[in-house]
From Swiss-Prot:
UniProt keyword terms in alphabetical order: Coenzyme A biosynthesis, Cytoplasm, NAD, NADP, Nucleotide-binding, Oxidoreductase
Family matches, as Pfam families: ApbA, ApbA_C
Catalytic reactions on record: (R)-pantoate + NAD(+) = 2-dehydropantoate + NADH + H(+); (R)-pantoate + NADP(+) = 2-dehydropantoate + NADPH + H(+)
Pathway note: Cofactor biosynthesis; coenzyme A biosynthesis
Protein name in UniProt: 2-dehydropantoate 2-reductase
UniProt organism field: Thermococcus kodakarensis (strain ATCC BAA-918 / JCM 12380 / KOD1)
KW Cell membrane (keyword) present: no
Locations listed in the record: Cytoplasm
Length: 309
């Protein structure tokens, strides 16, 4: 399968490496530093598994349409990334978002009706250019967005599973996206404020109550919007924490790199949707404010993330 991965960060690089190792025609589209490192030395994955591959890598999307375009950029870059890649989105190209947050699939639907929503609980960390820590094997769920089924989705799931990405298919992609956003509201919120690995949120009994309260708040908002879940977000939360207990969440990684975070598309979206149905989401709003404050304080500063691995 010809696959383009738009966004060669932690998850994009991990998925691209696994798919390339399995023999797929993979092109990673990313930042110049990452592209140069991959083209020079290959892409090295270590942690849960260790291997090196050398997929194609470029800073610009090729003009030839792929079978599958995987969206792995940060949510705040989705609109710009899709616009830059629009020339390669052919009539038969499918777009799959494996991003955190809410609203990315809606943007993709403006370019093509062939959109899949995806969630993954794999833990990954780009410790340096061309080098990805696979901090924990998780599950991946994909489906036609917002709901429904298509044979190509099943084909993608088969390709992913053959590549070692544990993948299942859903007919309720929007429900899974909301469940994952609620999981991220806990892990990325508390984990970033406390600056701890995911596992700490489960190991510290004093954090269980607030974790449940944050998740329930998101569930109440989703319920008012008519969102149905195939898996309860709390079940997904504890499973994700256990699978990725040695990982630092992506929001904290961004803070340590002095970069913008995706908190507007996680907590911010939950608060936005809550207000749209006449509700408040005070816990999510508090975490939103606190993470944004850390983002401003650390903007432009960098920390050697490999020190925490």
């Amino acid at each position: 399968m010809r696959i383009y991965v738009l966004g060669a960060g932690s998850i994009g690089s991990l998925f691209g490496a696994l798919l390339a190792r399995a023999g797929n025609d993979v092109t990673l589209i990313g930042r110049r530093e990452q592209v140069d490192a991959i083209n020079k030395n290959g892409l090295h994955v270590f942690g849960a598994e260790e291997f090196t591959v050398k997929p194609k890598a470029t800073i610009y999307a090729p003009e030839e349409p792929p079978d599958l375009l995987i969206l792995a950029v940060k949510s705040y870059s989705t609109k710009t990334a899709l616009e830059c890649a629009r020339q390669c989105i052919g009539r038969n190209t499918w777009v799959l978002s494996i991003q955190n947050g809410l609203g990315n699939e809606e943007l993709a639907l403006k370019y093509t009706p062939n959109v899949m929503g995806g969630v993954t609980t794999n833990g990954a960390m780009l410790v340096e250019w061309g080098k990805v820590l696979w901090a924990g094997k998780g599950i991946t769920v994909i489906g036609r967005y917002p709901t429904g089924r298509d044979d190509f989705v099943d084909e993608v799931a088969s390709v992913f599973n053959e590549a070692g990405i544990d993948t299942s298919v859903t007919e309720n992609a929007i429900g899974w996206k909301w469940a994952k956003a609620i999981v991220n509201s806990v892990i990325n919120g508390l984990g970033t404020v406390l600056e701890v690995k995911n596992g700490h949120l489960k190991d510290d009994p004093h954090l269980e109550g607030i974790s449940v309260d944050i998740a329930r708040e998101g569930c109440m908002v989703a319920q008012q919007l008519g969102i149905e879940f195939e898996i309860h977000p709390l079940e997904l939360l504890w499973d994700t924490i256990e699978r990725t207990r040695e990982n630092y969440n992506s929001t904290l990684q961004d803070i340590w790199r002095g970069r913008e975070t995706e908190v507007d598309y996680i907590h911010g979206k939950i608060v936005e949707y809550a207000r749209s149905v006449g509700m408040e989401a005070p816990r999510n709003e508090l975490l939103w404010v606190l993470v944004k404050a850390k983002e401003r304080i650390n903007r432009g500063k960098t920390r050697n993330i490999s020190e925490g691995c």
